[in-house]
Regions:
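Charged, compositionally biased boundary regions
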Residues: 1-17, 21-24, 37-330
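Short beta-strand scaffold segments in enzyme catalytic cores
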Residues: 26-30
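Short acidic-glycine loop/turn motifs at beta-strand connectors
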Residues: 31-35
Length: 330
């Protein structure tokens, strides 16, 4: 999904860009060289002071955007959507960012405030078309992208632990592969862990899933070692990314308490890198619940909050990976 040519396209694209169907929200999409860049969503503004809107504009500016698309999902019972759009437009203009589209959504109808043709955008708006009837949805599914979650709650449910994660016997299996950082054979354990990550990833890439529970438990345990985790962070490329995303999400749901943070960070990082910011934050929340001071989670939190471009994060990861490989394999 690189270009959006109409309000209809924009409405269809937003759930794919943020991972779920937003409500009571303000969504901004950055545009660079006529292509979609970053999408960000915030709760529908209650405080309409300049500072809050300028902060949103600063994130779009940090993405080196030339222009932006704005959509306000006005909550039921509110009537200030046009004012929210005007405030957002003013903040973006102060940041030197052009406004390519500005849409108000209220009570199941949408209207572009930039369109003054009432035959195109009547005052009462037009009904929002079903997502699954749009070309954007069809193209996204053909490209291998999953349909967006119905709500933020459904997205959160996708990263919750499953029943296996709470079984005592499963915890014992994972613990057997946990790495003691003072182990005299640490380097061999690191090599074993890195190799296990690749073996499991190949299973997910080839079959979409792995039924090798021993290998899954082994990888979850080995990820407790920082070098193994960092090796895993850099192991995917463009061709293998979908398999790795499926793997980290599967392992995140299966990770027992005390082993969640490493794989949650891996799931968050790859989601962020491929533009799924909402899923990235949901996974990161699980990391903090498991280990509030986990260093990689703190780093990712700073990256996400700063609105660091995903491509910059990917570059950092690719530059780090050869160094990690050299440390593990020599």
């Amino acid at each position: 999904m690189t270009t959006l040519t109409s309000p209809h396209d924009l409405l269809a694209a937003i759930p794919f860009l943020i991972g779920y169907h937003p409500i009571d929200s303000l969504v901004l999409v950055s545009i660079k060289e006529d292509c979609v860049g970053m999408a960000m969503r915030i709760d529908y503004p209650i405080d309409q002071g300049e500072v809050a809107f300028d902060l949103c504009a600063s994130h779009i500016s940090a993405d080196e955007a030339e222009g932006a698309l704005i959509v306000a999902y006005q909550p039921h019972g509110r009537s200030d959507g046009y004012e929210v759009l005007a405030q957002t437009t003013a903040a973006l203009s102060r940041a030197g960012i052009a406004i390519y589209e500005s849409i108000l959504i209220a009570d199941g109808f949408y209207r572009s405030v930039l369109c003054h043709d009432i035959t195109c955008c009547p005052v009462g708006g037009r009904p929002i078309p079903p997502l699954d009837s749009t070309q954007i949805a069809a193209e996204s599914v053909v490209a291998g992208h999953p349909m967006p979650f119905a709500s933020f709650a459904d997205l959160g449910a996708s990263v919750r632990s499953n029943l296996l994660a709470h079984e005592e016997q499963w915890l014992e299996r994972v613990q057997k592969s946990c790495v003691d950082p003072l182990d005299s054979d640490l380097n061999n354990l690191q090599r074993d862990g890195a190799t296990a990550v690749i073996d499991l990833a190949n299973d997910f890439i080839a079959h979409g899933i792995s039924t090798d529970q021993d290998l899954i438990a082994h990888v979850l345990g080995r990820l407790s070692e920082i070098q193994v985790r960092d090796f895993a962070l850099g192991s995917h490329d463009l061709d293998s990314a979908d398999g790795y995303r499926r793997m980290w999400m599967h392992l995140l749901r299966s990770a027992p308490p005390g082993f969640v943070a490493p794989v949650a960070c891996l799931a968050a990082a790859i989601a962020y890198e491929y533009g799924d910011g909402a899923l990235a934050r949901a996974a990161l929340d699980r990391a903090f619940t498991d280990a509030p001071t986990y260093s990689l989670a703190l780093l990712l939190q700073r990256v996400f909050s700063a609105g660091w471009p995903p491509q910059s994060f990917a570059q950092m990861r690719s530059e780090l990976h050869p160094k990690v490989c050299a440390a593990i394999f020599g």
